[in-house]
């Protein structure tokens, strides 16, 4: 069984930065060992000047998928939801994965969970905690692992 992880980089970064930080190398190891992930996609923004961070993540065997950013009134805007959904769905149709791990709390991904369930592909959601997990995801009746409860494994 091939297991791919799809990480909503904005959600993970935003939440971990505001709470407790994350060691991406340890997080990758956790995904590989606990969930047997053979490929880990990290969807994130591309900001000029952050190339060393991207190289570091790539060296840790993350497959980086970038979204171009837009600066509006001095704030950087971006969203990789569509890219994550397209990559996950295409992986199923190309017979590259049979199980998915999705790291997010965003209810916009409820349709992706429905897709995996319809295709009878096991799916596990990793969300920050109960209050940072959309009701739309919670009601999908899939395994949800709360990162706050296992954060000691990747801090």
Residue ranges of predicted features:
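Short, well-ordered beta-strand core segments
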Residues: 63, 100, 143-145
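Acidic beta-strand-to-loop metal/phosphate-binding motif
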Residues: 41-45, 99-105
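Phosphate- and divalent-cation-binding pockets in alpha/beta enzyme and binding domains
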Residues: 52, 87, 111-112, 135
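Internal catalytic-core helix/loop-beta-alpha segment
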Residues: 72-103
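Well-ordered alpha-helical segments embedded in enzymatic catalytic cores
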Residues: 26-27, 83-87, 108
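Acidic, PIN/NYN-like endoribonuclease modules and their adjacent C-terminal/linker elements
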Residues: 113-155
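A generic secondary-structure signal
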Residues: 30, 87-91, 115
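Domain-level signal for Mg2+-assisted phosphodiester chemistry and nucleotide/NA-binding surfaces
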Residues: 1-80, 118, 122-124, 130
């Amino acid at each position: 069984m091939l297991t791919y992880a799809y990480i909503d980089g904005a959600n993970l970064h935003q939440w971990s930065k505001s709470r407790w930080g994350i060691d991406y190398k340890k997080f990758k190891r956790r995904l590989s060992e606990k969930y047997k992930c053979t490929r880990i996609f990290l969807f994130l923004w591309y900001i000029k000047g952050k190339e060393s961070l991207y190289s570091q993540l790539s060296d840790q065997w993350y497959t980086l998928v970038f979204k171009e950013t837009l600066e509006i009134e001095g704030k950087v805007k971006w969203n990789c939801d569509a890219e994550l959904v397209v990559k996950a769905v295409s992986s199923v149709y190309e017979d590259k994965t049979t199980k998915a791990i999705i790291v997010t709390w965003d209810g916009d991904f409820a349709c992706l969970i429905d897709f995996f369930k319809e295709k009878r592909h096991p799916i596990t959601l990793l969300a920050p905690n109960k209050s940072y997990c959309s009701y739309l995801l919670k009601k999908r009746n899939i395994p949800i692992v709360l990162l706050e409860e296992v954060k000691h494994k990747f801090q």
